[in-house]
């Protein structure tokens, strides 16, 4: 198929989807007044009605259309012509006329003998290897509804008749329907294809001259139906009848007596053979009488053909040759397998693919709404639909599985294995060869002699052979089917088989429980979606990909249970992603937020576990060694790699950060005091906030998740250091051992939300002060671990760079390999005196006058990482390289090159979190752009401090004057800072 040809059909496909969407949502868009499906019997009709009801309930079908499913009357096989007349009677009963009515009639009442796995559900609702844009897997019915959505706008009234086993690809804009008569929609196909179908031969007026049904290549050539390219005008099964033709045709059955004469199993009229033939301009009545019927030559058929000829002969059938167009016939099982495995590549331009609604671990087989568990072996060219393969099962090459669970079995090659639940609750699994023709008497390519007489009547075909045992469970029925195969191969348990109640392909489909089939498909589809969801997570997929899986239906309670079971068995990194992505997919709901919280709870538990492995709670079992102690620490500025130190990224990937300790106004801004109290209580004070609290109940000290609690940091430090337990205990027992306790924190001259690491450094100062108070011997690593635990207990989610930056003087390059227990390597960067002087002269902090709560921002950034946002993953990796390069340039004294890296980092920071900047920050940088060489935020950004590197020769006073001129008295100002 040529590229331009494919592009045209693809665009037509996309246009059809847009027409379909308009038919659902626009009241002025022309739609079918009636969509009628024909069915072979009431059971099949009920199955069709259920399928339609499901789609209507989900608003997937045009609401203005009247839907009807009409089984052959009285359960008799009346042929497609009889079914058409039955449809006409239905519409006329409803409307009284055909004028002004647009009717779509899809003939879908066959037994599907050539593809028996679709006998029960009907080939019309058999799967197509395509996932629709709304996330649903497609069926032939869905393709008809979508593909024909544009046709009503092309016709005034009348009926479009389609064959339910042929998928047509064309552009409705090419349809030019006649006002009266009929029109046959035809595509060009190779003569080798045409010989197995109907072929039209055009007369001089552009009408159908002859209708040649399943003729040889020689016959088609001799009748002039083959063009120079070896192509024929194939009968696609799509025919338009005008309203006046329908009215005349209806006169044949407008009374009960007439209806009974034409719609019965003796006449068994064919729509294509008996209604189209008289419309061909060169046909004759004598030839018409001799045309091969769907059933048998009978007197009733002869009489009906005479009447049909008289009614239709005055009309002609225009031949509508559409191109580019394509005709896809869902014929035999062998053809179906070939189409689903190798054939899909020819239709990739239609988004057809081997794996639809499933997870394929290999490209050597195809599946549709199926699951294959680890340890199973699926050989080449298999096709699995609505099936579950587990327990190290082996599926032989070329085999087709349908509606079956196979556990631990070895299924032979080139067979079909199809299970049905029957209306009495029992099961039958039918096995036959992919190449078998059920209309014939062969089985698995050989005779059926091994089974003896397995027929009730004279039809000794596989279709009627009662060889399939009925069992109490699907698993037992699979075993029984494999025994049938073994018997055909000359082995097997004959006694078990002969003593069992058995059914045929025919009788089993007529006894099928259609509701159970639909329930099975839906149940499996839910499980498959879970597998796809988990696969997206495990394969570093994104939230958008995860949401696409559930776009057509909300996550059910059953699916949530499956996901939670998988999460329970997963490692912590997978588990947190599962919960986070599940919460995001569920949207802004209470349940969704609960799952997101569980994701961060997993991170918190992981960090606490890592800290515990390093030995947190060091103050436990210690007595105070001092009456009072005080700790003062500097702040830090982050230059490179910030965010890579944040759990869970650092635990999973490792982290690299470059930062420096600073003083503000020449002072150490962070201060913590701890002292003994005579009373049995804990007193906490946040001096800079003017808050003081007295605690005598331990549970009040264990509540650490409120970011607005002025004592949340104090409480978390007491828990992390082991002064009080995280849960349980009595405060009176603790104070009896260590006495009363006073802990006070204070930040000197630092605005809230500064971005200078105040919270984490304050946590580190609390830990350091408690260690000193209790006389705990410790290393710097102990301080870092405990401070990080404080962060996690508060649910801030912060990393380790702030503690290192504030507790250790100078410029540091800090690295940590991946691992739940973070082992920090701190390398002090030795700078020349000239470089230090230049940095202190050019490096400047600017306060924005704004603040941003880091807790919410951390959730966003961490969420983007664990949901595998591609730009976030890239930036988190790249900023670590920049941190190392910054250290390299500063060690060489290349401050200008450091400034360039600072700018590059700023762009990457915005990729990690777009909220790190805003209009005000952008305006500040714009106002001083000519004065600075480098720019960066402090901490998370979005407020607090900005850091800049002045151009050579520019003074801090010049910068301050520019800011004051631009922003007046709104709080934007240069702050005095010193690198130490």
What kind of feature is each model-predicted range?
Residues 2-347, 379-386, 390-392, 396-542:
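Unchanged
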Residues 87, 144, 178, 599-607, ...:
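Stable alpha-helical structural segments in soluble proteins, enriched in small hydrophobic residues
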Residues 89-92, 277, 719-723, 768-772, ...:
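Short glycine/serine- and small hydrophobic-enriched flexible loop segments
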Residues 121, 125-126, 754-776:
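DPxDG-like acidic metal-binding loop motif
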Residues 348-374:
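Surface beta-strand/loop "capping" patches
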Residues 491-733, 776, 785-797, 803-937, ...:
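C-terminal nucleotide
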Residues 726-750:
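Glycine- and acidic-rich phosphate- and metal-coordinating loops
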Residues 750-754, 932-935:
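Short pre-catalytic strand/loop immediately N-terminal to key active-site residues, enriched for Gly-Thr
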């Amino acid at each position: 198929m040529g590229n331009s040809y494919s592009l045209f059909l693809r665009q037509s496909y996309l246009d059809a989807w847009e027409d379909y969407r308009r038919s659902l949502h626009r009241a002025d868009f022309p739609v079918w007044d009636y969509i009628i499906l024909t069915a072979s019997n009431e059971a099949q009709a009920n199955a069709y009605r259920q399928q339609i009801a499901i789609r209507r309930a989900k608003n997937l079908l045009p609401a203005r259309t009247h839907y009807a499913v009409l089984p052959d009357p009285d359960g008799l096989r009346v042929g497609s012509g009889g079914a058409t007349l039955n449809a006409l009677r239905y519409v006329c009963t409803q409307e009284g006329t055909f004028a002004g009515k647009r009717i779509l009639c899809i003939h879908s009442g066959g037994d599907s003998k050539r593809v028996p796995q679709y006998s029960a559900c009907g080939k019309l609702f058999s799967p197509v290897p395509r996932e629709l844009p709304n996330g649903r897997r497609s069926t032939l019915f869905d393709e008809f509804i979508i593909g024909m959505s544009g046709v009503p706008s092309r016709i005034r009234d009348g009926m479009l008749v389609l064959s339910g086993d042929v998928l047509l690809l064309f552009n409705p804009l090419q349809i030019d329907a006649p006002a009266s008569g009929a029109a046959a929609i035809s595509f060009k196909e190779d003569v080798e294809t045409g010989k197995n179908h109907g072929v039209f031969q055009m007369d001089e007026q552009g009408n159908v001259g002859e209708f040649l049904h399943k003729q040889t290549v020689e016959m088609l050539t001799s009748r002039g139906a083959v063009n120079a390219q070896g192509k024929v005008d194939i009968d696609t099964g799509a025919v338009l009848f005008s309203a006046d033709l329908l009215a005349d045709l209806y006169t044949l059955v407008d009374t009960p007596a007439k209806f009974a004469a034409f719609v019965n199993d003796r006449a068994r009229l064919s729509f294509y053979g008996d209604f189209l033939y008289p419309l061909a301009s060169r046909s004759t009545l004598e030839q018409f009488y001799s045309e091969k019927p769907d059933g048998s030559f009978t007197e009733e058929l002869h009489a009906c053909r005479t009447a049909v000829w008289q009614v239709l002969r005055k009309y002609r059938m225009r031949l509508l040759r559409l191109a580019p167009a394509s005709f896809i016939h869902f014929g035999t099982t062998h053809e179906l397998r070939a189409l689903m495995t190798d054939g899909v590549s020819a239709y990739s331009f239609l988004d057809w693919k081997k794996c639809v609604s499933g997870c394929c671990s290999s490209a050597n087989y195809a599946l549709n709404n199926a699951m294959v568990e680890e340890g199973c072996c699926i050989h080449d060219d298999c096709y699995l639909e609505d099936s579950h393969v587990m327990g190290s099962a082996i599926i032989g090459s070329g085999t087709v599985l349908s509606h079956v669970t196979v556990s631990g079995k070895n299924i032979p090659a080139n067979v079909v294995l199809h299970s049905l639940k029957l209306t009495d609750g029992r099961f039958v699994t039918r096995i036959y060869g992919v190449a078998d023709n059920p209309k014939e008497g062969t089985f698995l390519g050989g005779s059926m002699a091994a089974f003896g007489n397995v027929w009730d009547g004279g039809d000794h075909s596989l279709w009627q052979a009662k060889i399939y045992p009925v069992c109490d469970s699907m698993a037992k029925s699979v075993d029984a089917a494999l025994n049938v195969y073994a018997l055909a191969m000359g082995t097997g348990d004959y006694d078990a088989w002969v003593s069992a109640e058995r059914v045929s392909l025919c009788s089993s489909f007529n006894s099928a429980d259609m509701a159970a089939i639909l329930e099975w498909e839906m149940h499996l589809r839910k499980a498959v979606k879970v597998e796809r969801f988990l696969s997206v997570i495990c394969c570093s997929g994104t939230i958008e990909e995860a949401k696409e899986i559930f776009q057509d239906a909300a996550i059910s309670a059953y699916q949530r249970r499956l996901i939670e079971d998988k999460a329970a068995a997963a490692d912590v990194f997978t588990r947190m992603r599962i919960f986070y992505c599940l919460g995001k997919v569920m949207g802004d709901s209470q349940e969704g937020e609960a799952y997101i919280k569980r994701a961060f709870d997993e991170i918190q538990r992981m960090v606490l576990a890592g800290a515990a492995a390093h030995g947190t709670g060091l103050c436990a079992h210690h007595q105070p060694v001092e009456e009072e102690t005080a700790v003062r620490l500097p702040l830090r500025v982050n230059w490179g790699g910030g965010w890579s130190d944040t759990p869970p990224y650092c635990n999973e990937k490792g982290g690299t950060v470059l930062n420096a300790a600073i003083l503000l106004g020449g002072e150490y801004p962070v201060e913590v005091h701890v002292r003994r109290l005579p009373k049995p209580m804990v007193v906490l004070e946040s001096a800079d906030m003017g808050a003081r609290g007295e605690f005598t109940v331990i549970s009040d000290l264990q509540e650490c998740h409120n970011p607005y609690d002025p004592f949340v940091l104090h409480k978390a430090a007491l828990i992390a250091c082991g002064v009080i337990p995280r849960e349980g205990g009595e405060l009176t027992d603790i104070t009896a051992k260590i006495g009363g306790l006073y802990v006070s924190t204070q930040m000197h001259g630092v605005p809230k939300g500064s971005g200078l690491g105040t919270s984490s450094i304050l946590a580190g100062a609390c830990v350091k002060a408690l260690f000193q108070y209790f006389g705990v011997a410790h290393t710097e690593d102990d301080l870092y671990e405990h401070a990080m635990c404080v962060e996690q207990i508060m649910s801030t989610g912060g990393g380790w760079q702030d503690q290192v930056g504030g507790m250790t003087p100078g410029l540091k390059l800090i690295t940590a390999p991946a691992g739940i227990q973070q082992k920090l390597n701190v390398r002090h960067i030795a700078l020349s005196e000239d470089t230090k002087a230049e940095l202190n002269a050019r490096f400047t902090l600017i306060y924005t006058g704004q603040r941003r709560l880091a807790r919410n921002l951390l959730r966003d950034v961490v969420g983007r990482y664990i949901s595998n946002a591609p730009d976030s993953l890239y930036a988190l990796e790249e900023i670590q390289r920049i941190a190392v390069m910054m250290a390299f340039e500063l060690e060489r004294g290349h401050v200008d090159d450091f400034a360039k890296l600072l700018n590059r980092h700023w762009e990457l920071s915005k990729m990690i979190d777009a909220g790190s900047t805003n209009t005000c920050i952008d305006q500040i940088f714009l106002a001083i752009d000519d004065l600075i060489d480098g720019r960066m935020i402090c901490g998370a950004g979005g407020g607090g401090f900005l850091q800049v590197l002045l151009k050579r020769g520019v003074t801090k006073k010049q910068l301050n004057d520019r800011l004051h001129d631009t922003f007046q008295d709104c709080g934007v100002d240069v702050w005095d800072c010193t690198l130490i």
